Amino acid sequence: MAHKKAGGSSRNGRDSESKRLGVKVYGGQAINAGGIIVRQRGTRMHAGENVGMGKDHTLFALVDGHVKFTTKGAAKKHTVVVVPAAA
């Protein structure tokens, strides 16, 4: 009688799916209008010129151009700007 004893149960074995947050287009790279620049939780980075913010705080380009990351003010807030491409 070749029986196998029942395996014990484990309280592990779960993990949440990654949310794929972070910078999608880096400084100096070209981007088209509507392109996602940063996916984030909260305003870790703020929208500057030619950058819009979605309801989930995603930053996206409003015009075609190049991405530029800057820091502003005494608090050194990170701001994302899109420099428009020469028409």
From Swiss-Prot:
InterPro entries: Ribosomal_bL27, Ribosomal_bL27_CS. Pfam families: Ribosomal_L27 (PF01016). Residues 1-21 are annotated as: Disordered. One of its GO terms (cellular component) is cytosolic large ribosomal subunit. GO terms for molecular function: structural constituent of ribosome. GO terms for biological process: translation. The keyword Secreted does not apply. Keywords: Ribonucleoprotein, Ribosomal protein. HAMAP family: Ribosomal_bL27. PANTHER family: LARGE RIBOSOMAL SUBUNIT PROTEIN BL27M, RIBOSOMAL PROTEIN L27. Belongs to the bacterial ribosomal protein bL27 family. This is Large ribosomal subunit protein bL27. It comes from Burkholderia mallei (strain ATCC 23344). The lineage of its organism: Bacteria, Pseudomonadati, Pseudomonadota, Betaproteobacteria, Burkholderiales.
